[in-house]
């Protein structure tokens, strides 16, 4: 089972940017923990991070035929990008939306997601553990289909 975790804009700053909201673990630390968990779950996990919407779309499109499931934290693009939504729908790869913070307990403009209604699920608000929960969820789903 091959999985891809896509992180969007500013997530390269996790651990440094607003730690009271996003936590103190760096993206590299989170990814290291996820690799261990993925291995335990029998999954291969690849990582991609970009601040560019176009690069994220290219990554999604290039995943066809090589990736069984996607975990995506689109960052601020969650609330603005119909293009990311269209890319995810276009490749028809199951995906789980992930956020470190609870987007529904923050500013009103963060309450709208262009991704969640078509996702297998949405995990938010558990800090770095959101990624682990999302990983466990998508692996469980893919083992059943």
From Swiss-Prot:
Its EC number is 4.2.1.10. Pathway: Metabolic intermediate biosynthesis; chorismate biosynthesis; chorismate from D-erythrose 4-phosphate and phosphoenolpyruvate: step 3/7. GO terms for biological process: amino acid biosynthetic process; aromatic amino acid family biosynthetic process; chorismate biosynthetic process; quinate catabolic process. The record marks 17 as: Transition state stabilizer. Keywords: Amino-acid biosynthesis, Aromatic amino acid biosynthesis, Lyase. It catalyses: 3-dehydroquinate = 3-dehydroshikimate + H2O. Transmembrane segments: none annotated. One of its GO terms (molecular function) is 3-dehydroquinate dehydratase activity. The active site is at 22 (proton acceptor), 99 (proton donor). The keyword Lyase applies. Substrate binds at residues 73, 79, 86, 100-101, 110. InterPro entries: DHquinase_II, DHquinase_II_sf. Catalyzes a trans-dehydration via an enolate intermediate. Homododecamer. Belongs to the type-II 3-dehydroquinase family. This is 3-dehydroquinate dehydratase.
